[in-house]
Structures are given as C-alpha cells and as structure tokens.
Amino acid sequence: MPTLQGTFWCFTLNFSGDAPSLSFNERVQYACWQHERVSHDHLQGYIQMKKRSTLKMMKELLPGAHLEVSKGTPEEASDYAMKEETRVAGPWTYGELLKKGSNKRKLLDRYKENPEDMELEDPAKARRCRAKIDKEKFIAEFKVEDDEQEWKKILEKEIEKIASPRSILWVYGPQGGEGKTSKAKELITRGWFYTRGGKKDDVAYSYVEDPTRHVVFDIPRDMQEYCNYSLIEMLKDRIIISNKYEPITNCQVYNIHVIVMANFLPDVTKISEDRIKIIYC
C-alpha cells in the first residue's frame, strides 16, 4: 500500500493529568494547538511541514498522536485547531503560517498563465516551474504495476521500520525486468529522492533542496564499474557535502532509508559488507 504523506496535518493527542508540552524542529513551518476537553482531555492541533512528510515521520514528531492529512485550507484548519468552544488552555503556536497566496504559488501561477514569457525572461525559473508541474502530474497519474512480488513485500517491511544509521538496502536483480525501476518510480510518488548515481557534487546539490528525504538509487547496468559508493555512504551518513557552484555542508540529525536498485551485487572492497542488506528479486 502507498504510504500516507502530506505537508499539512491535523492531530489529536489524548492525555490525563497535566497537558504535555510540545516542541518542534526545523522541519516544521508552522504549528498551532490547544488543550481541549469534550469527553476527555486532549491536545487538538494543526501542523504545516516545510516538505511533504510520511505518516511515519509525523508519528516520530508526535508520538502517540492520532494524525490525519488536513483537507481544508491552512486558515480553516488553524482556526478549527484554535476554536474557543472546547478550549481549556492555549492556544499555542510555533513558526509562521503560510497561506495559499505565497510567492511560490504566485510564481507557478505566472508560469501557467504565460509560460513563453517566463521562458524568455527567466529560463531557470521557467525550468523549475515546468519540472514541478510535471512532477505533480507524474505523482497524480503514475500507476503501480505488479506490487505483489515477494521482494517488494520484503522491501516494504524494511522501509516501514525506523531507519537505521548504518544499513543500506541493496535490491539485486541480475536479469532485468524484475520491476526495480518501476518500484523506484513509485517511491518518487511517496516523496523519495530518486537518482541514477553520478558525480557526488551534482547529486548532493540536487539532494540538499530537501535533505530530509529517503533516497533510492536506480543504477543502470553499464554503471557497475563506476558505481559511486562514496556518494551512497555520504547520503546515508547524513553529512551532505557539495562543492557545486559554492561549498555547502548540510548536517542532518534524522536517519533515512537508502535503497540501491542494481543488476549487480555490491563491491565489498569499496563499501563495508556489514552495511549492506541484500534483497534478492
């Protein structure tokens, strides 16, 4: 089953005794919440994440809370979370609420209205807008093929677990046609970062746009000799370094899953064997 994910979330956290205090990290754009009492005490709240987040990531952020992707506008959801009728204490807030009239949305609207003008005025922004629109279309229209293969079930069980700081999942299918690339595409629709490998600076530069993402490498058969094990380990180790255009070192606290889809087994002279968990197609 595809993983539930979203940017805007509503939550309810039941408790007894004193109301729990909440704290948030840099992944959160905005949060509001209050102590309510209907038949029992609970915290009712709304969270805007900076990037799309899975249900699992949200449960790590708010252990014990019931979470749902918000369906209304940001204003409606925050107003509901801070309604007076059932309030006992609060409300409390964190960060700044982003409304639907943000600059990012206006830029996309401008592109949709007249893409030709933007391509002439600012080709770089036009390319980013086109890429975002195409990705949204891909996510909406991508169809999962055979998702009942045994290796895919094993892989899903692994990525449902809390990511370890060390283990790398290596999906090995020597013949081709096992569905590795299709699975990698499906992971894109769930917010994963997709790459076919390459130069470390180039891949890291793309990744640091959102360095909280899980990563799937879809390595072509002809890249076996040039597989960049240093890049794979760098992303897994959560210290991301890129010297493309300007030196950037991005340090991350939270562990991620890293999957390598390949037609070949890992070269254990180039990567520690104990880091690799092989899943056979």
Curated annotation (Swiss-Prot):
Segments carrying motif Nuclear localization signal: 51-71, 97-103
Annotated localization: Host nucleus
Transmembrane portions of the chain: none
Segments carrying motif RCR-2: 42-44
Residues holding a divalent metal cation: E36, H42, E85
Residue span, CRESS-DNA virus Rep endonuclease domain: 3-97
Note on how the cofactor is bound: Divalent metal cations, possibly Mg(2+) or Mn(2+).
Statement: the UniProt record of this protein carries the keyword Amino-acid biosynthesis: no
E.C. number(s) listed in UniProt: 2.7.7.-, 3.1.21.-, 3.6.1.-
BP term (GO), one: DNA replication
Keyword Nucleotidyltransferase carried by entry: yes
Motif residue range(s): RCR-1: 10-13
Further details from the record: The genome of nanoviruses is composed of six to eight segments. In addition, some isolates contain subviral DNAs.
Subunit structure: Homooligomer (Potential). Rep binds to repeated DNA motifs (iterons).
Family (UniProt): Belongs to the nanoviridea/circoviridae replication-associated protein family.
Domains: entry comment: There are 3 rolling circle replication (RCR) motifs. RCR-2 is probably involved in metal coordination. RCR-3 is required for phosphodiester bond cleavage for initiation of RCR.
Name of the protein this chain belongs to: Para-Rep C1
Gene this protein is translated from: C1
